Amino acid sequence: MNKVLYALLTLAAFTSCANSFNIQGTSNVSSLDGRKLYLKTAQGDSLVNLDSCDVVHGQFAFHGTIDSVEVAQVFMDDVNLQFPVVIEKGDITVRLDNTQQRVSGTPLNEKLNDFWTKFTQLRNQYAEIDHEESAAILNGHDEETVNAQLIKKALGVYAKGDKLFTKFVTENFDNILGPWCFMTRITYDTTPNAYPVWMNDYMYANAINQLPSWVEYIMTKATDSFKQNPQVKAFYADFLQAQKEMNGTAEPAAEAVPAAGTTPDAVAAPPTPAQMAGDSISR
């Protein structure tokens, strides 16, 4: 009996080790020192703490075990630091700075870091366009003419984002990053007042108009495992219902588009272009 019990305990310990994650973090943001950080993931419409820690002299760490690979976010109290991390077994390294954020150490986190860096660069371009508009108006240029020219520039940034999302989702259909990126774009594109005021109405309408065809394109290309992801499956069912309602072929049902910040795994809407001019994780 003792031998059987010992064997079971050994197996349990081995399994726990095999599914454990270890996140070592550093930060040079002075306002984070002494603060408590939380690693949170979404379960349904709720956020669940995976672990928490204090930042001490710019150092922090998260540890735990997982049943399956998922995407989590780092919070300072209730403030989402807009820093996604893939929770998978292995040693993960994160760096939180005002100017740069990086996650590395495991295969999926390397992929995520590459995508998030490019996505952040595109978001910054909206802020740059906003600054360009303000400078032009201050210099006496006609506001309507300036805005018309810069809207075209903003649409070019949106087109680059469309290609970035499409490429990343299709390259990651069969791991957690595909569904996560798919739902992240939906959350981002359906967030009202996401752009600087002078371009918001036009850019938001453009995003909403483009989204249905993008969703259909992704779903026609998607693998079975992607389609069976619970979040994707639930969203797409609501999306199809909403499309039928718009065409007058179905009774009204739940809205297809989730509210910003409620999308599973995305956890919260990414920082919007309207926030980027002074955006920093120290706020």
Where do the model's predicted regions map?
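Charged, long alpha-helical assembly modules
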Residues: 170-173, 177-283
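Extended amphipathic alpha-helical interaction segments
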Residues: 154-170, 174
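A detector of low-complexity, intrinsically disordered, Ser/Thr/Gly/Pro/Ala-rich segments
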Residues: 8, 13, 115, 260-261, ...
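A non-transmembrane, solvent-exposed segment enriched in polar/low-complexity residues
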Residues: 17-156, 162
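Bacterial Sec-dependent N-terminal signal peptides
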Residues: 1-29, 282
